[in-house]
């Protein structure tokens, strides 16, 4: 059996340049860029931002980012400061959810919802 090295979602971007700036402000590093895609990396994980947008897809796209301490990550990253700069929806601070995980929520400029969750183990 082949060893699986990663799963990288393709994330839509309504405004490709604004989305790249948004993710860099969140701490992602841009590792590749051309006119149709950008690869953004955080730690050892990455995703592919695509210069492609369909409203219904973007607004139903969700990604979960798992961290060891969500409160510490939230305090360090300060996602609330991105609202005015990028005209994104207000983030929801971390709180214990009904499914048992502590999660904060962040919207990107295209409406993609990120669940920033504390690792439960």
Give the label of every model feature segment.
Residues 63-113:
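Vicinal oxygen chelate
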Residues 48-50, 105, 115-117:
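Conserved beta-strand in the GNAT
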Residues 34-36, 57, 98-102:
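Short acidic/glycine-enriched loop/turn segments that link adjacent beta-strands
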Residues 46-48, 55-57, 111-112:
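Short, charged/polar, Gly/Pro-enriched secondary-structure boundary elements
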Residues 40-44, 106-109, 119:
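Active-site beta-strand termini and strand-to-loop segments that position acidic
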Residues 10-47, 53:
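Core segments of cupin and vicinal oxygen chelate
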């Amino acid at each position: 059996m082949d060893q699986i090295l990663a799963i990288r979602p393709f994330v839509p971007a309504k405004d490709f340049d604004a989305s790249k700036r948004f993710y860099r402000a969140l701490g992602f590093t841009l590792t590749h860029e051309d006119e149709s895609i950008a690869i953004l990396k955080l730690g050892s994980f990455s995703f592919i931002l695509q210069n492609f947008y369909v409203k219904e897809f973007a607004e139903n796209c969700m990604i979960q980012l798992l961290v060891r301490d969500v409160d510490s990550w939230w305090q360090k990253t300060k996602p609330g400061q991105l609202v005015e700069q990028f005209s994104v929806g207000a983030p929801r601070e971390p709180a214990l959810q009904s499914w048992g995980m502590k999660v904060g929520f962040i919207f990107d400029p295209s409406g993609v919802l990120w669940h920033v969750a504390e690792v439960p183990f």
